[in-house]
Every structure is written in structure tokens, then in C-alpha cells.
Amino acid sequence: MNNMKTFKFLTALFATAILTACTLDMERPTNVQYIDKTDAIWQQHLQKIQKIQSYQAKGQIGYISPTERFSSRFEWQYQNPKSYTLKLYSLISKSTLLIQMHQSGMTISDNNDNQQSAANAKLLLQEIIGMDVPLEHLAYWLKGQPAMNADYQVGTNHLLGAFTYHVDGSQWTADYLTYHSNNSMPENILLKNDSTKQTLKIRVDEWIY
């Protein structure tokens, strides 16, 4: 890639007013009631989502940090920790950004044939997009599966309600605001990291698994 500045185009081409779905309250919900983790219906659902090894999700995403603010449509395809893709579509242009994880690391490319690869996926995401989001964990967070060592809560709907998880010395929280009624998969998710002041609002419109 010849010009890193022309490639880092999210601010110019993706930046816009955060989509309506993501301008809903960015603060964590309060006065939420939870039930015991041993709930039989929750345990049955947990076993179901643990068996979903590969899947696709489509929807919209809004991201806010001290240095970046953008919203886009997204397509997420996950096979395993070394094979997944995240495609972002600008809401105000035809621009696209493709993030691909593979055996040798990560590649980020756009629809103008700009491309950058690196073995360190975390640093590449920060350099190109300005995001410090652990995509390897997002694969589980997106489908509402808490990590084994996560501090999580089960909602009165017998589904994952919220969790707290430490990654690279900082703390992420997630609140599962709504679920799809037809498959009990997450619909609206609020992810926050108060240490890095990042907020990620995700709306999943379609699940394929």
C-alpha cells in the first residue's frame, strides 16, 4: 500500500451521524433484573450457542471513541479464531472495508485496491481504523456466549443479560438489550470499555448458522 493516509478513510467516508439504531441511549441500562445462572432454560440455550461454531451475522454498527466516530452496515462471517471476515459498508458512499483474519495474521483492504497486512491483528486495527476492539472475543460476544471466566448475568428472558470481561488490562462490559424472537439470538448489543472510552452499538438484523 503506497499511502497509509489515503487508506485510513473511515473518518472521511464512514463518519456520519450515528445511525438511528445506534443513537439510542449509549449508557448502560439500570435497574435490570437478573436470574440465577443455573436456570435450566438458560443452560439449555447456552449449550445451543456453544455448538454454533461457524456463523454469519448482518446488521449495523455504530462506534465511538475519543478519536473516531463512524457507523456502517456490516457483514460478519466466522469459521474459527484464525478464519473470519468483517466487511463494513459506508452509509454515505459506496466505500467498503474488508477485514480478513487468516493463518498468517490480518489483512485490511478497501474497494480502491488499497491493502495492508500484518501478523499483529490488534496493532493493524488500531493503525488503519483506530479501533481497539478484540475481534477474537467479539466472535463469542456477538452470539451471546459468555467466556468461561467472565462475570455474567442472565436476564429474566432466560438469555444472556450482561457481562464484564477483562482483555489486555482493560475491562469490557456488554449489555444485551433485545433478542430476536424467532431464534433467541442477540439483536441489539451495547459494548463499552470505560478505560479506553470506546462504545460499540451493534444491531444484528440477520443470523445465518
Swiss-Prot record:
Organism: Haemophilus influenzae (strain 86-028NP)
NCBIfam families: lolB (TIGR00548)
Stored Gene3D superfamilies: Lipoprotein localisation LolA/LolB/LppX (2.50.20.10)
Lipidated residue numbers (S-diacylglycerol cysteine): 22
Keywords linked to the UniProt accession: Cell outer membrane, Chaperone, Lipoprotein, Membrane, Palmitate, Protein transport, Signal, Transport
UniProt name for this protein: Outer-membrane lipoprotein LolB
UniProt xrefs under InterPro entries: LolA/LolB/LppX, OM_lipoprot_LolB
Localization per Swiss-Prot or TrEMBL: Cell outer membrane
Membrane topology according to the record: Lipid-anchor
Keyword Lipoprotein: yes
One cellular component (GO) term of this entry: cell outer membrane
Function per UniProt: Plays a critical role in the incorporation of lipoproteins in the outer membrane after they are released by the LolA protein.
Hydrolase in keyword set: no
GO biological process, one term: lipoprotein localization to outer membrane
Record's subunit section: Monomer.
Signal peptide (residue range): 1-21
